[in-house]
Amino acid sequence: MNIKISADSTCDLSPELVERYRIGISPLYIVRDGESLVDGVDITPDEIYDHVARGGSMCSTAAVSVYDYVEFFRKELESADAVVHFHISGEMSACYQNACIAAQEVGNVYPVDARNLSTGIGLLVLEAAELAQNGQLTAQEIQQRMEQRRELLD
């Protein structure tokens, strides 16, 4: 079974790791001074830090919509049998909830609430990518294992 690992852009993995493990990235929206920008496309983390350092207002995120997730998952499934997708903590964003709704509509998508962000998500994503490449677990088994592993990050 060909399993694709994907994550939202808050995983902060380097482009090299994303390419090496063929990780799909679903960008969140960054809201800066009332303007909605696509994370990693319209604005980078360095630009966010510079904006705040220069005295600009704090930026916030806006969740990926159910529609955007449906489109993203369908695209990922063009080259895979199943997708295991990691999200910023459900306590911080509606991304996980929206992805679960989209996953039910699309099928063969296994969302994981990382209950974390940045490096915490990134570590889970990399471990899942290695498990997927190994090919010995199903997508659901990877999802379950990562839900157990996330407890070690707290």
Where are these regions (language model features)?
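N-terminal glycine-rich anion-binding loop in soluble enzyme alpha/beta folds
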Residues: K4-S65
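Short beta-strand segments
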Residues: A7, H85-S89, D113
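A short, well-structured juxtamembrane/interface segment
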Residues: V64-K75
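Glycine-rich phosphate-binding loop signature in dinucleotide/nucleotide-binding domains
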Residues: E76-A82
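Short Gly/Thr/Asp-enriched flexible loops that form oxyanion-binding sites at enzyme active sites
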Residues: I88-V106, L123-V125
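Long, charge-dense
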Residues: V112-L124, I142
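Internal, active-site/partner-interface "lid" segment
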Residues: E130-D154
